[in-house]
């Protein structure tokens, strides 16, 4: 019986699960957005939320505790210098899980796990892509207009 046992097993041993969660946390804090299975995303979300809440104290002991979980010094520096000031006022809910659908190979439900205030990175990329597309469409329209003008000139000459 699983009385008062929280969390998902994820079909792994305890050490493998903790290594997985540490790795997912490091990737999330480094890239601000990761794509993984729904179960891993939901489990990593609770882990990251607790870690960020703990890191908000911002003292030496907490930094050492975070370093024991995240083995990349650059990511830890980024957490304390960039991420915490941006989401420090928030009382919780630092991450969101966006469901994507099934993975092609094994139909596993996929999801995106992202930091809440950092989705502007994705929006910026989408805007750049849209601007590029608009420029291409405008260039194509200009080219078409030139062809029509040339055709009109040829007809007038005849």
Language-model features: locations:
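Primary mode marks residue(s) on the alpha4-beta5-alpha5 output face of response regulator receiver
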Residues: 157-158
């Amino acid at each position: 019986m699983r009385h008062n046992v929280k969390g998902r097993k994820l079909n792994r041993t305890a050490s493998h699960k903790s290594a997985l969660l540490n790795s997912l946390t490091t990737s999330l804090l480094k890239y601000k957005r990761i794509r993984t299975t729904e179960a891993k995303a939901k489990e990593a979300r609770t882990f990251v939320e607790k870690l960020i809440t703990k890191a908000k104290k911002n003292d030496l002991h907490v930094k050492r505790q975070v370093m024991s979980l995240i083995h990349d010094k650059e990511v830890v520096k980024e957490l304390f210098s960039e991420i915490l000031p941006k989401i420090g006022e928030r009382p919780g809910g630092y991450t969101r899980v966006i469901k994507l659908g099934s993975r092609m190979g094994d139909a596993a439900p996929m999801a995106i796990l992202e930091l809440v205030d950092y989705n502007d990175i994705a929006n910026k990329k989408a805007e750049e892509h849209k601007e590029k597309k608009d420029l291409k469409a405008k260039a194509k329209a200009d080219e078409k207009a030139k062809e029509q003008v040339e055709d009109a000139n040829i007809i007038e000459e005849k």
